[in-house]
Amino acid sequence: MVLLESEQFLTELTRLFQKCRTSGSVYITLKKYDGRTKPIPKKGTVEGFEPADNKCLLRATDGKKKISTVVSSKEVNKFQMAYSNLLRANMDGLKKRDKKNKTKKTKAAAAAAAAAPAAAATAATTAATTAATAAQ
């Protein structure tokens, strides 16, 4: 994985979007980063380790090429503006998903059709009971 500066990351991310425009996907992850390069031991925290400031780790991949950058809290506003403009410019090829309302409607119609004979039988039983009590 290649760790890039913020501006280089945005440039490479634009290239990834252009490469995957016709077919393929770009996966982007964002998480808090405290500067550790080694995993946290199971027993607890490492003595003497104090993170200087909060940072964000951004990673992007198309399945073959991986890029990443670390953004400090001081430059996060500037980076987010550039990042949001890049996303707006390159996410024009999104397709609207077919919602699953069609399957819900068919299931609801099937349930109503199954319930209709039962409701008719209940109504007939009620009518017969009413007629029997009226005849007595």
UniProtKB/Swiss-Prot annotation:
Record GO biological process: SRP-dependent cotranslational protein targeting to membrane
- Location in or out of the cell: Cytoplasm
Looking up InterPro entries in the UniProt record yields: Signal_recog_particle_SRP14, Signal_recog_particle_SRP9/14
> PTM Phosphotyrosine: at which residues?
Y27
Q: Which Pfam families match?
A: SRP14
Superkingdom is: Eukaryota
One term under GO cellular component = signal recognition particle, endoplasmic reticulum targeting
Q: Which UniProt keywords apply?
A: Cytoplasm, Phosphoprotein, Ribonucleoprotein, RNA-binding, Signal recognition particle
Q: Where does the UniProt entry say this protein principally localizes?
A: cytoplasm
Could you tell me which cysteines form disulfide bridges? none
Q: What are the protein's GO molecular function terms?
A: 7S RNA binding; endoplasmic reticulum signal peptide binding
Keyword Cell membrane among UniProt keywords: no
What job does this protein perform?
Component of the signal recognition particle (SRP) complex, a ribonucleoprotein complex that mediates the cotranslational targeting of secretory and membrane proteins to the endoplasmic reticulum (ER). SRP9 together with SRP14 and the Alu portion of the SRP RNA, constitutes the elongation arrest domain of SRP. The complex of SRP9 and SRP14 is required for SRP RNA binding.
User: Subunit details for this protein?
Assistant: Heterodimer with SRP9; binds RNA as heterodimer. Component of a signal recognition particle (SRP) complex that consists of a 7SL RNA molecule of 300 nucleotides and six protein subunits: SRP72, SRP68, SRP54, SRP19, SRP14 and SRP9.
Give the similarity note. Belongs to the SRP14 family.
* Official protein name in the record: Signal recognition particle 14 kDa protein
